[in-house]
């Protein structure tokens, strides 16, 4: 796959002007959509298989703690699922590392476009999940989009064989290679942007992750 992106196209995702009545109305609609989906249970996913543990915990809105945003499985000292996730990611790495770097970059560009299409919805989730203001949530989503665009272009920049200083009688090459499986543990205060940045940087370089 040959990407049509060029290194000089990267621009920061613009923030939403909520003083525009149309933008404010669109965001309110996104909030109502997300509100209707609150309280659902979200399973653990390993290798495409959905798993649920007996013990659960609620993720609640910090501004209104009676509001349950989502229900999640609660782990304990049993690390078997963690071991399984790492092993599964290791298996995926064997094929993912061989995907051409331009194709890996194109996946990030596609992810950025999908996030643009659902920008208000993603931001609305953060209004409930961490009680962000509209502008703070919008900035978080914009930064996540920026990470996709930035790391995709960085992969295009560094993915090919790099120049080396020639030495008489030697034949040298210099290229970056993927290393394996990484663990992504993002902070709570930027639930989309930092998670996206850590994940996209690793994945576009040919690695796999456990998130």
Question: What do these predicted regions represent?
Answer:
Residues 49-51, 64, 73-79, 115, ...:
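Short, glycine-/Ser/Thr-/acidic-enriched flexible segments
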Residues 44, 156, 176:
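Short glycine- and Lys/Arg-enriched binding-loop motifs that mark or flank ligand-binding interfaces
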Residues 60-159:
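Glycine-rich loop-to-alpha-helix module at the N-terminal edge of alpha/beta enzyme cores
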Residues 1-69:
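Hydrophobic face of amphipathic alpha-helices that form TPR/SEL1-like repeat modules
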Residues 161-211:
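Conserved small-residue-rich beta-alpha loop and adjacent elements
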Residues 43, 71, 123, 181, ...:
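Beta-sheet entry/capping signal
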Residues 48, 104, 148, 182, ...:
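Residue-level signature of catalytic and energy-coupling elements of molecular machines
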Residues 46-47, 74, 98-100, 160, ...:
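Generic structural "secondary-structure junction" signal
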């Amino acid at each position: 796959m040959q990407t049509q992106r060029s290194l000089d196209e990267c621009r920061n995702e613009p923030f939403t002007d909520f003083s525009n009545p149309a933008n404010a109305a669109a965001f309110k609609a996104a909030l109502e959509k997300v509100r209707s989906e609150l309280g659902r249970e979200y399973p653990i996913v390993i290798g495409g298989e959905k798993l649920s543990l007996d013990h659960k915990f609620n993720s609640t809105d910090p501004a209104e703690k009676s509001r349950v945003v989502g229900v999640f499985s609660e782990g304990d000292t049993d690390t078997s699922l963690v071991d399984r996730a790492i092993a599964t990611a290791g298996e995926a790495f064997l094929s993912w590392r061989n995907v051409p770097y331009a194709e890996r970059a194109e996946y990030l560009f596609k992810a950025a476009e999908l996030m643009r299409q659902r920008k208000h919805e993603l931001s609305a989730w953060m209004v409930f999940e961490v009680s962000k203001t509209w502008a703070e949530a919008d900035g978080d989503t914009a930064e996540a989009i920026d990470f996709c665009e930035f790391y995709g272009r960085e992969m295009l920049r560094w993915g090919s064989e790099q120049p080396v200083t020639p030495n008489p009688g030697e034949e040298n090459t210099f290229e970056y290679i993927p290393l394996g499986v990484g663990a992504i543990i993002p902070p709570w205060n930027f639930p989309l942007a930092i998670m996206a940045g850590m994940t996209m940087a690793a994945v576009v370089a040919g690695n796999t992750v456990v998130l």
